[in-house]
A protein has these predicted regions:
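Catalytic zinc-binding patch centered on the HExxH motif and its immediate surroundings
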Residues: 20-47
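Pan-zinc metallopeptidase signature
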Residues: 142-197
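Post-HEXXH active-site segment of zinc metalloproteases
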Residues: 80-108
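Short pre-active-site segment immediately N-terminal to the catalytic Zn-binding motif
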Residues: 50-69, 102-105
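Acidic helix-start/capping segments at beta-turn-to-alpha-helix junctions
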Residues: 4-27, 93-95, 132-138
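Active-site recognition of the HExxH zinc-binding catalytic motif
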Residues: 46, 64, 68-81, 111-112, ...
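Short helix/loop segments within enzyme catalytic domains
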Residues: 1-8, 102, 106-149
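Solvent-exposed loop/turn segments at secondary-structure junctions
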Residues: 21-24, 50-54, 73-77, 84-88, ...
Length: 197
């Protein structure tokens, strides 16, 4: 996995483990729960309780699901390094609410694809017990993230189809990353423009 393929140079993000709820993070008033990335601080916030619940889920996909959660948030860091975050923020500030939401969803699906790239890389190096199963990953996350949970995350709940895409879209883009091993295959923005998101 080489970020140079996207024209960027990798600079590490800070990983910050926190106890939920978080009163304030990334200039957003809390309470905040769950994993999220803060571009202003180049920091991935990881909720210990969330990760412990996920680790406690007894499925074959648990270890990969933990990696997927962290990889998805680090994918937002990569999006920032290569300029995608800035372009998305600019587009969202100049568009209608509906278009801004669609742009955010496209951005989140690209992060899922990048997470798929990482899962492929980790699997090839023997860092996963079993080959990643995208449906199993999302099932493990759904099992610990009830829809009724009113907790806030940035920019929205992990399972919210309005911010992160539908289950089918997430499965598709995770699989694209797993199958391709290529950052360029994760061009969700061109796919959205062609009506193929």
């Amino acid at each position: 996995m080489e970020i140079a393929a996207l024209g960027g140079q990798y600079q590490g993000a800070t990983l910050l483990f926190y106890e939920s709820p978080l009163d304030r993070g990334c200039d957003v008033a809390g309470p905040l729960r769950g994993p999220f990335y803060c571009p202003a601080a180049a920091t991935v916030y990881l909720d210990r309780a969330y990760l412990q619940r996920l680790a406690g889920a007894t499925t074959d996909s648990t270890r990969a699901a933990l990696g997927y959660v962290v990889a998805h948030e680090l994918a937002h860091h990569i999006q920032g390094l290569v300029g995608t975050t800035l372009l998305v923020d600019q587009a969202r500030s100049r568009s209608t609410r509906a278009l801004a939401t669609r742009t955010l969803t496209t951005y989140e699906l690209q992060a899922d694809c990048y997470a798929g790239l990482w899962l492929r890389w980790a699997g090839q190096r023997g860092n996963l017990v079993a080959p990643p199963d995208p449906a199993g990953l999302l099932d493990a996350i759904a099992a610990i993230s009830p829809r009724s949970d009113a907790s806030r995350t940035v920019p929205g709940p992990w399972l919210d189809p309005l911010t992160h895409g539908t289950r089918a879209q997430r499965l598709k883009w995770l699989q694209v990353g797993l199958d391709s091993g290529d950052f360029n295959a994760c061009d969700t923005f061109s796919a959205e423009a062609a009506g193929k998101l």
